[in-house]
Design a protein with these regions (language model features):
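C-terminal outer-membrane beta-barrel translocator/porin domains of Gram-negative envelope proteins
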Residues: 7, 21-31, 146-151, 155-238
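Gram-negative/organellar outer-membrane beta-barrel architecture
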Residues: 2-167, 236-238
Length: 238
């Protein structure tokens, strides 16, 4: 408002919009042959960080498979379906060394990495990402012949990922599915010790029968070329 002698200027500051989410989880497994594992995890997602709708996800897990992961999801424009997503990760897990289909030792594998993905949302439930990443780490003998050498490694890779999530509830879904498909190409030109390819598929499906609901899921991963068994191993269901 402007009077004869004074001017009142009001500058409104927008409030950060969006709802933050905290999730907790527990995973227990047993192979009925004396080998069991547990994991406790938590994730925190901050939404609406800036006017473009950026999100910041941080995930922590302790137990048999330890992980610290953080990712910043940044849309490229208001209402844009395109985005970039830089990330960093630290993980540690137990991996068996296999000889003639029999385990000969168990290693403790530590990996540190970072990368950048560029992607696009597909409808309201899907997205596709393409990116590059780099990781390095070491593997020390935990159980078995202590004279076996420790291993250090470097990884550099391209990756292509597709995901589709139509579950109707994050915690207790009654319908829908969660699908993920990922392909990685490890290349010496990106700093990798070896050249090889990997792909992984996951599926969780919610089925309801009257008052009862079942969630069925599966994971499958495969290394397509010759590679170091310890450092390239999958750990499914963690």
């Amino acid at each position: 408002h402007k009077g004869d002698e004074h001017t009142l200027v009001i500058r409104a500051r927008g409030k950060r919009t969006g709802t933050d989410y905290l999730r907790l989880g527990l995973n227990l497994s047993d192979d009925m042959e004396g080998d069991s594992a547990f994991n406790i995890g938590a994730s925190y997602r901050m939404n609406g960080i800036n006017r473009l709708g950026a999100e910041w996800l941080t995930r922590l897990q302790i137990g048999d498979q330890q992980e610290l992961y953080t990712e910043f999801y940044q849309p490229l424009d208001v209402g844009s379906r395109y985005f970039i997503a830089p990330y960093a990760a630290i993980e540690s897990q137990n991996v068996e060394a296999i000889l003639d289909n029999d385990p000969v030792a168990e290693y403790r594998l530590e990996r540190y990495g970072f990368g950048l993905n560029v992607g696009r949302q597909i409808g309201n439930s899907g997205e596709i990402r393409f990116g590059v990443g780099e990781a390095w780490g070491k593997a020390d003998v935990r159980i078995g012949d202590q004279s076996l050498p420790s291993e250090s490694f470097n990884e550099g890779f391209y990756q292509l990922k597709y995901s589709f999530d139509s579950l109707d509830n994050v915690y207790f879904p009654h319908a829908g599915e969660d699908i993920g498909l990922a392909f990685r190409q490890f290349e010496p030109e990106l700093g990798s010790d070896q050249r090889y390819r990997q792909w992984e598929f996951k599926l969780d499906k919610a089925l309801s029968f009257g008052p009862d609901t079942y969630v069925l899921g599966g994971r499958y991963g495969r290394t397509l070329d010759q590679a170091n068994v310890v450092t390239s191993s999958f750990l499914l269901g963690g």
